[in-house]
Amino acid sequence: MVYHSSFVDEEGVTKACGCPLLPLKSHIKGPAPVSEQDKTDIVDEAITFFRANVFFTNFDIKSPADKLLIYLTFYINVALKRLEGCRTLAVGTKAIINLGLEDIPVPGETGFPFPGLFSLPQSQDEAELFRNYLKQVREETSGRLLSVAYRANGTPNKWWLAFAKRKFMNVVVL
């Protein structure tokens, strides 16, 4: 069974490219509203549901937040692929930082992993807003992913890194 986002009806949430810019429990500067620390945010959901959702090739979208959940599941898959050969937390952190420095394409640009999932930006401002939100949510996801992909002593958690070999929705990760 595919796990869906609990952010079904988010009234008053700004949208860009058909995706809600959901609040994040984040200290990283960006366009996302700040969520309360004790509440679950979309990054928590993506990490929690990743190991179950990564096995599915089809994902029935029930709310706009599911689109973001799909994107984050794919991003976690990419990040785990980068962490696959990293034997220590320090090396893994460096790999994740390098991943964060890569360009972030938005719908309509080459390299965007899910054409058709998100609507095309109606203006350059909307494209930049969405790009900045994706950058912020990716950085937040990366930080939290490192805390589960590596144990407290800095060694890899093989239970998590084993999922780097999976293809999510039959999308090949390079």
From Swiss-Prot:
From the Swiss-Prot or TrEMBL record, state where the protein is found.
Cytoplasm, Cytoskeleton; Cell projection
Primary subcellular site in the record, as a coarse category: cytoplasm
Q: Which InterPro entries match?
A: ARPC3 (IPR007204), ARPC3_sf (IPR036753)
Q: Does the keyword Cell division apply?
A: no
Q: Which GO terms describe its cellular component?
A: Arp2/3 protein complex; cell projection; cytoplasm
Residues in the signal sequence: none
Top-rank taxon, per record: Eukaryota
Provide the GO biological process annotations.
Answer: actin filament organization; Arp2/3 complex-mediated actin nucleation; regulation of actin filament polymerization
Record note on quaternary structure: Component of the Arp2/3 complex composed of ARP2, ARP3, ARPC1/p41-ARC, ARPC2/p34-ARC, ARPC3/p21-ARC, ARPC4/p20-ARC and ARPC5/p16-ARC. Interacts with SCAR2/DIS3 (WAVE complex).
- Similarity comment text for this entry: Belongs to the ARPC3 family.
Protein name, entry field: Actin-related protein 2/3 complex subunit 3
Species this protein is from = Arabidopsis thaliana (Mouse-ear cress)
